[in-house]
């Protein structure tokens, strides 16, 4: 056989009559199977009936305890030779001092800016050389150091990970560089209405005395106060093995993971770690509209909500179904109303951000400026309707199918599975939690949805935050008479 470049493939030298005969043979074979019989059996007026999906089978979560009290969880997934490691620490922004918001996220950032004998460029270069992805971050509830690496590069990548977690240098020059970079990023937020709403809304809902009310990355003033000694102090107080858990997902066994991690983290020194701070949710106030003026804004950004629920709530599964119906999917009520029916927005959504403490419930959209008041009317209509009217059975079934049929995708890759299993470590959930997830979603009834809607969505106590051009939207909002209007700035502070 010789390559035929004109055909882009291989031929056997067939030409002329031989090629024609071959074609006739193909036609003859095809004609043996008439299609009319199959067509007669199909009723194309009805959609095909799908069989029930197979039960979701998840690998077991195996556990062990390393020297120093470090807890290890391993999820074996051997189809692809990659490994994901997540070190989860009780070092989130809930630990930020009241006078220094942003310290936890800044400390997490600094872990990659020099560790052991490596500077920031050497850390980045070595991760790239190993084909690894190394990330450090902090949320309100936890700090996470994560590593994704091919199995054959696991051991040298673990050496790099150990340096980053155990031996950060916090060089003054790098603290200064990262501090100035963050200050510039914060200044830029003032030009982004969506970012403004993301900062102002939790500050208004919770107030600055609650951990969830403080900006995750701090303010311009608090960032200017960041110094090496404060970063090192925070690290020393929170980055301890007795306040950490390691999750390993991928092509590795429990015995192998325990051996490799003990060799690198077995000497991690325990230390006294203060309990995670508790904070009561603020008392609800009567429905109020908070207007953040952004002159010349192309759209108005709307956030409507109040304090919601903690991750440990027994209503979690009913709330997942409720939110899918209300605003958790493209076909949900809010998006169908504000986008598809009225054309006020490209997308309207809702979410219960359940955390270690009671996180916020929020419904949100960026809307046409001239339709700000009309959008608020439709938002409030849908938020009241989900409480007042029972959910029809077809809508309930569709929401439950949306959740359960999408669940397998959360465990298809080691990275996706690691992200879901990480929830178990952050929130102290049972290790078999996801094995029963679909079952508990399917057990939710229409009565459950209405019950949790009435309990956890309270229109009389909504904080309605609107970021937009005051000169264009104020009159329309006032005419709605949905509550007093209070003027706030980027940080949620009152403007006199």
Q: What are the language-model segments listed below?
A:
Residues 42-49, 116, 122-234, 397-419:
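Acidic/histidine-enriched segments that form metal/cofactor-coordinating
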Residues 181-200, 280-299, 336-345, 355-356, ...:
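Short acidic/His-enriched helical or mixed secondary-structure segments at domain edges of catalytic enzymes
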Residues 93, 303-307, 326-367, 488:
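A structural supersecondary motif
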Residues 42-49, 208, 212, 216, ...:
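An aromatic/glycine/proline-enriched structural segment found at the starts
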